[in-house]
């Protein structure tokens, strides 16, 4: 049975890079349909023609025989679908049911627990750097700092402490001491947190080493080149 036609609806400067990496690591053939952000860094309306929410990534899967299409949204669900339907050699998903459960857990953990406090910190950083006139800028920074201190910065630490512990006890990876779909999906928010100084790499040596290890994969380099060709820099 032949594999379906796979299309990635790609938005520049987005987390869709992880999907390219996943597909490349599994040696799957796919087409990239690119979209550009507007002057306000928003997704273009064309994406809403593919999915009502107009977000990226979106994965289009078309049966070669019937022509029937599926549009998949939400990164965790897309990863779960790809691993379930296309990773027949168990390259990034384990045959062991218990290990597979652990991998699937992280596919939901990323957006459900890790990403929210990081997104709050990101929004607060934008508030502080918004260029508002004094004294509004002073008050905005004070409010942003209070929110960060009361919730998001502490929750970022809580999440990073958890991930640090998981990698430390699993021989340098999230699950079972080897690369899985969970590692690929988790890479982006942890990288961005370090780059935006929401967490310090020196405080999390296991995460730092893990990032260096997984980004040395040939599939990462191949996907990075594709992203650069599309106008994104990772």
Curated annotation (Swiss-Prot):
Domain GST N-terminal: residue ranges: 3-90
Top-level taxon in the UniProt lineage: Eukaryota
One GO BP: glutathione metabolic process
Every GST C-terminal domain range: 96-234
Membrane-related topology note: Peripheral membrane protein
Reactions catalysed according to its record: RX + glutathione = an S-substituted glutathione + a halide anion + H(+)
CDD domains from the UniProt entry: GST_C_GTT1_like, GST_N_GTT1_like
Gene3D superfamilies in alphabetical order: 1.20.1050.10, Glutaredoxin
Localisation per UniProt entry: Endoplasmic reticulum membrane
Entry EC no(s): 2.5.1.18
Pfam family, one: GST_C
GO molecular function: glutathione peroxidase activity; glutathione transferase activity
GO cellular component entries: cell periphery; cytoplasm; endoplasmic reticulum; endoplasmic reticulum membrane; mitochondrial outer membrane; mitochondrion; plasma membrane
UniProt keywords, alphabetically: Endoplasmic reticulum, Membrane, Transferase
Keyword Transferase: yes
Record-linked InterPro entries: Glutathione-S-Trfase_C-like, Glutathione-S-Trfase_C_sf, Glutathione_S-Trfase, Glutathione_S-Trfase_N, GST_C, Thioredoxin-like_sf
Family as reported in the entry's similarity comment: Belongs to the GST superfamily.
Subunit text: Homodimer.
Protein name according to UniProt: Glutathione S-transferase 1
Source species: Saccharomyces cerevisiae (strain ATCC 204508 / S288c)
Taxonomic lineage of the native organism: Eukaryota, Fungi, Dikarya, Ascomycota, Saccharomycotina
